[in-house]
From Swiss-Prot:
Claim: Transferase is one of the keywords in the record: yes
Recorded name of the encoding gene: proB
Record key words, sorted: Amino-acid biosynthesis, ATP-binding, Cytoplasm, Kinase, Nucleotide-binding, Proline biosynthesis, Transferase
Family membership noted in the UniProt record: Belongs to the glutamate 5-kinase family.
Annotated protein name in UniProt: Glutamate 5-kinase
A GO term, aspect molecular function: RNA binding
The organism of origin for this protein: Mycobacterium bovis (strain ATCC BAA-935 / AF2122/97)
Length: 376
């Protein structure tokens, strides 16, 4: 299969490769260092061809199952975190040993959703990853499961890999798992499931039924599709391919499903506002303000706000909602929640001079379509 979108992945200089838990385990569920070594070999070939590669690797919890004498993946949070603590050591040591065969050094980068959502930590993570690449080390990124709470079910690193792809300015993202691409329904349950080789946008997914997670990983098809749409909307093409064909996927992108990127890449700040930052509150707008913000790309003024919810400070990211409560945009708010509550519905001329700035400036606004809102 050849297409301009596959060619973009085949020729990408900067690449993020996400390796799922099921790609690193045996059929019985035990961590398999041999499988990891095979994936490292495929990545090494791509790097020898001139690409810079960052690896987002799941598998810490699975790698901790056997050393702790567990018979299966734990279900309670404390045991998951204990398994991740033990397994992360084995995981990064395996990557280190695999790349040492090629004279390469690896660096471990553990992140949480909170790290990505906070602007300072977000920037520091970006600098660290950039520096590792400049020093020719292979960055191995994983979610820090030992301190994560709800994030431990973040999607088997699918969403994290999409965020990292934009964070490092990657030219493409490759999601490797135990599936060979996207189908209109689960091919394991439906004999006539139709393979979807290319997705140009969310509209192509109307009617597609995504499967649930595997027994070892936490990232089902819905998680992978959501991550792929996130990256593609931010300007990064994505290949969803089977880990068993990693060598082919990384060599010529001729397998799996490709998600076409939007023509213009989001700026780092707009991407952070749109996808990475945690919204700490919400503003409900009247219909006129929704039109101004979404269609005309204008700044939000206090007169168009009908309600304020949440506890936030100036500089935080908030959701902008239509009268029916549907999110229509996200943006950086200029005022504290308590201050803004006194401004609701008032025209600029009614406000004192220090409160006449836009509530959310157009430069700090990112509109969100109904389909996109489901990906946040």
């Amino acid at each position: 299969m050849r297409s301009p979108h596959r060619d973009a992945i085949r020729t990408a200089r900067g690449l993020v490769v996400k390796v799922g838990t099921t790609a690193l385990t045996t059929p019985s569920g035990m961590f398999d260092a041999g499988r990891l070594a095979g994936l490292a070999e495929a990545v090494e070939r791509r790097m020898k061809a001139g690409s810079d590669v960052v690896i987002v690797s799941s598998g810490a919890i699975a790698a901790g199952i056997e050393p702790l004498g567990l018979s299966r993946r734990p279900k309670d949070l404390a045991t998951k975190q204990a398994a991740a603590s033990v397994g992360q050591v084995a995981l990064v040591n395996s990557w280190s040993a695999a790349f040492a065969r090629y004279g390469r050094t690896v660096g471990q980068v553990l992140l949480t959703a909170h790290d990505i959502s906070m602007r300072v930590q977000h920037t520091n993570a970006q600098r660290t990853l950039d520096r590792l690449r400049a020093l020719h080390a292979v960055a191995i990124v994983n979610e820090n499961d030992t301190v994560a709470t709800n994030e431990i079910r973040f999607g088997d690193n699918d969403r994290l890999s999409a965020l990292v792809a934009h964070l490092v300015g990657a030219d493409a993202l490759v999601l490797l798992s135990d599936i060979d691409g996207l189908y209109d329904c689960d091919p394991r349950k439906t004999a006539d499931a139709t393979f979807i080789p290319e997705v140009s946008g969310p509209a192509d997914l109307d009617g597609v039924v995504a499967g649930r997670s595997s027994h070892l990983g936490t990232g089902g098809m819905a998680s992978k599709v959501s991550a792929a749409l996130l990256a593609a909307d931010a300007g990064v093409p994505v290949l969803l391919a089977p880990a068993a064909d990693a060598a082919t996927a990384l060599a010529d992108a001729s397998v799996g499903t490709v998600f076409a990127a939007r023509p213009a890449r989001l700026s780092a700040r707009r991407f952070w506002v749109r996808y990475a930052a945690e919204a700490t509150g919400a503003l409900t707008l009247d219909a006129g303000a929704v039109r101004a913000v979404v269609r005309q790309r204008r700044s939000l003024l206090a007169a168009g706000i009908t309600a304020v919810s949440g506890r936030f400070c100036g500089g935080d990211v908030v959701e902008l909602r239509a009268p029916d409560a549907a999110m229509v945009a996200r943006g950086v708010v200029a005022y504290d929640a308590s201050e803004l509550a006194t401004m609701v519905g008032r025209s600029t001329s009614e406000l004192p001079g220090e409160l006449r700035r836009p509530v959310v400036h157009a430069d700090d606004l990112v509109a969100v379509s109904a389909k996109q809102a489901k990906q946040v």
